[in-house]
Amino acid sequence: MNTISRRQFMAGAGILGADVLLNGCAKKEGDKEVSATEDLMREHGVLRRALFVYSEAAIRLRSNPSFVSADALEKTAKLFRAFGEEYHEKRLEEAYIFPAVKKAGGEAARYPDILAEQHQRGREITDYILAVTRGAKLNANNAKPLASALESLVRMYRPHAAREDTIVFPAWKQVLTAKQLDEISDKFEDIEREQLGKDGFESAVRQISDIEGELGLADLAQFTAHISR
């Protein structure tokens, strides 16, 4: 994603608490507007790439732990924590999106509590991954438990992110006016800069790209499905 500018947040009269949530984010990429939900899903793209690293690492850990870099897994976990858990989940979803969706009611309102519980479980698993990989060499003693932890995180977050992308985020956007979309956009931009610094998204993309390269996962063509005939 190219560097994206967001307009400054101006709280509208009468928009308080969870109602601020119902503001969306519109960004400009060149002359093209990018919606808040699209931006949230782009952030999910970074996290999905981290989950793919985890899933591939789990396979290798079960066959030959020496082929898995503990340092690469630690860097992935640190990225997942900083970009996913501390920024995307806590500062955007839990602070703004989930309260608004619950307040709006409807089908989507039953998801925020479940999603928040899964966020917490994910943080516990990230704690474990960081503890195992920090300055350690992976071997037969820690490889299988780590593989199980990685697999459980991937299994949880795949349907988790899919429900957010297809149910929760669209429900959030549906209750927004165009003005509210503009207002929340800059609030999210302020949060991103405060939490991650300038070019936070682009930095996250570079980090996960470097990790993929380190683990031999950078070439997309290698994952093209083969058909048995």
What positions do the PLM features span?
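Small-residue-biased structural context
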Residues: M1-R229
